[in-house]
Amino acid sequence: MNSIKDRNGLDLTEAEDIKKRWQEYTEELYKKHLHDPDSHDDVITNLEPDILECEVRWALESITTNKASGGDGIPVELFQILKDNAVKVLHSVCQQMWKTQQWPQDWKRSVFIPIPKKSNVKECSNYHTIALISHASKVMLKILQARLQQYMNHELPDV
């Protein structure tokens, strides 16, 4: 990427300036979806049962292979090669997260990849952005999604 426009329409050509512009753009783009993760005003103290090893195993097996890694660079295939050892380690981490309600900082980071969708590639808004997240983070996200889906199916069966 040779250049991109800043928010005022001026061309940015330095790699560091372009990187900062993309960071600024993605933060603005997703800001409306953010909330304060450290705000525990409405925390429900009656948590669901502990994370189970079988949930971790299922989540790990359901992650698609041959996909790009997130910021940690760990491919899902490594977890699948390590099998039970990976399940035990990820179970321990997921269980700790569940009990403390704290997401590891490294798991909060995503690598954003801009993909041009229009001919004017100097405007950030003319790109789709995809976010690469760590496969370890995907394990916990899949567990949470499955639990929420089960809850929704029970509470709203006809929707």
Say what each PLM segment does:
Residues 1-125, 131, 135-139, 143:
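Surface-exposed loop/turn segments and immediately adjacent short secondary-structure elements
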Residues 141-142, 149-159:
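Electropositive, glycine- and tryptophan-enriched low-complexity nucleic-acid-binding patches
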Residues 125-126, 159:
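Short acidic, glycine/proline-rich loop/turn micro-motifs
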